[in-house]
Amino acid sequence: MKIYIDGEWRDSSSGETIKKYNPSTGEVLDTFPAATRNDVDAAIDSAEDAFKRWSDMTSMERSKILYKALELISKDKDQLTDLLIKENGKVKREAMDETEGVIDQLQYYTEFERKLTGDIVEGTSNKRKIFQYKVPYGIVIAITPWNFPAAMVIRKLAPALLTGNTVILKPSSDTPLTAEWLVKKFVDAGIPKGVLNLITGKGSEIGDYIVEHKKVSLITMTGSTSTGQRIMEKASKNMAKLILELGGKAPFMVWKDANIERALKSLVWAKYLNVGQSCIAAERLYIHEDIYDEFMKKFIEVSKRIKLGDPESSDMGPLINKSAVETTEKYVDIARSSGYKILLGGKKPELSGKYKNGYFYEPTIIENVPQDSPLFQEEIFGPVIGAESVSSVDELYEKANDSKYGLASYLFTEDPELIFEASEKIRFGELYVNMPGPEASQGYHTGFRLTGQAGEGSKYGISEYLKLKNVYVDYSRGNLSISTVNDDLFKNL
């Protein structure tokens, strides 16, 4: 693959490349350029040159290009699905689902262009008005993760481009090929030179440089909390606007009156989707003591049936890389050494053929996990979940909220009073009641505490890419009177 700068596909200026591995087999899938600071400068200069032309276009004109990209992606959606399977390790049904999500998101944003409005506000007299315009920030750096490498690219690119910003896309080094595929569709759709640039490479080499660049106006990043904190530190030098979607530690709460089958299906989705590599993945399981044994028995049985291996026919894919496997093993080792009860899994599976070297890990269920354990306090990002019983709503709220993160949460109950009370008591940006995700395009994806700041999706997410500009107008005739200025100063001029 190549990077894309100033309307040209090119190699890194150093010629250096990095290997990309297939998570399912451990085999080399491709190589991609390791961009340099010179490449970053070239991309930023190109984006700066293109900004005036792009922002001067109407939102309708920009939307037409996005819509053409939507048509091209829809036409070749099977290619995207296959790429997600190979590069990310997704099983086929998950890859297909993400592809459809990409199409839905892009359609949502292309249809929003007629809703980009400002306000006219009354001034201090009847002949004064305040015109509040929404204008693009300028150059946007979009840093995207590997866990949903297509959906997250679109969730950042589409609103940024629609609102008149120019973009430099920096995808994860674990999924650069998906980003390249999507950028090609925008190029084929006729996006002008410099409006969209693609940079790949090591964050350690270009990460700090790109986010602290003086010409960058907005940075949007989905990733770890530690990375987000570093970006905040570096970007503060130039006061760049930040949209940061970071860590999560979702509580999955099942009350005594819950529909067990509905809760089980949703838990399988929330825990094992993408092998638990999701910021909204269920990582803490709280079940009412009256149904705890019944629920856990069924959850274990369902988890035993999950097939690993061939993405065409399996239920759960591999972790993204060797490091992710080691991290998962670290938390399971903590459980073992601490005496927690491992009810299922806790090891890598024994697979044969080309999948034997893949980064697979078995569904793992652990109980007797204390609230202060790393398994309940730190984001694991793997197919591991700790379980605990609760006896009261106060205990439920206290334990659910006991997290440094505050992104997604799940509640299963038939009690309307509990539903509405929990919607106020649970301090998370998203509460899914009697359903799994996924987040809808028209929903606002945001969180509390160390989950980040600002948000994405919906009309609120689009507004994050626009700066409110105020124009104060006095259209009265005659002399102007200002209370703090002496009119005598202007006599006989």
Swiss-Prot record:
Q: State the protein's name.
A: D-glyceraldehyde dehydrogenase (NADP(+))
Q: Which SUPFAM superfamilies match?
A: ALDH-like
**Active site annotation, chain numbering:** E245 (proton acceptor), C279 (proton donor)
Q: Which NCBIfam families match?
A: glyc_ald_dh (NF040792)
Q: In which pathway does it act?
A: Carbohydrate degradation; glycolysis
Please give the catalytic activity noted in the UniProt record: D-glyceraldehyde + NADP(+) + H2O = (R)-glycerate + NADPH + 2 H(+)
Which GO terms label this protein's molecular function in UniProt? Answer: glyceraldehyde dehydrogenase (NADP+) activity; protein homodimerization activity; succinate-semialdehyde dehydrogenase (NAD+) activity
The answer to whether the entry has keyword Mitochondrion is no
Q: Which UniProt keywords apply?
A: NADP, Oxidoreductase
Question: Which residues of this UniProt protein bind NADP(+)?
Answer: 144-147, 155, 170-174, 202-208, 223-246, 279, 379-381
Q: Which protein family is it in?
A: Belongs to the aldehyde dehydrogenase family. Glyceraldehyde dehydrogenase subfamily.
